[in-house]
Amino acid sequence: MSKLFFVVFLCLIISVFAISPADIGCTDISQADFDEKNNNCIKCGEDGFGEEMVNRCRDKCFTDNFYQSCVDLLNKVYEEKDTPPVQE
């Protein structure tokens, strides 16, 4: 299992260095902004959601709701709510 995790992690790391804004159709974004947003997507993928999460996060040049959900997840916006008390 650890070998599989290592391979997936390695693929994610390689994808960081192998992608530029033009590769996904982002022509109106600076390299610095792209790198920051792309790193957010990769962090979501590292949290166990995988390459599909990274790809969906990058959709529409990071303007899709999926990107915002990823950022919210990283910022722990989604917290578990307390369960209501059991009434007897």
Curated annotation (Swiss-Prot):
Residues 1-18 form the signal peptide. Expressed by the venom gland. The keyword Nucleotide-binding does not apply. One of its GO terms (cellular component) is extracellular region. Keywords: Secreted, Signal. SUPFAM superfamilies: Crustacean CHH/MIH/GIH neurohormone. InterPro entries: Crust_neurohorm_sf (IPR035957). It is found in: Secreted. Co-purifies with alpha-latrotoxin-Lt1a. Belongs to the arthropod CHH/MIH/GIH/VIH hormone family. May increase the toxicity of alpha-latrotoxin and/or other venom components. Is non-toxic to mice and to the cockroach Periplaneta americana. This is Alpha-latrotoxin-associated low molecular weight protein.
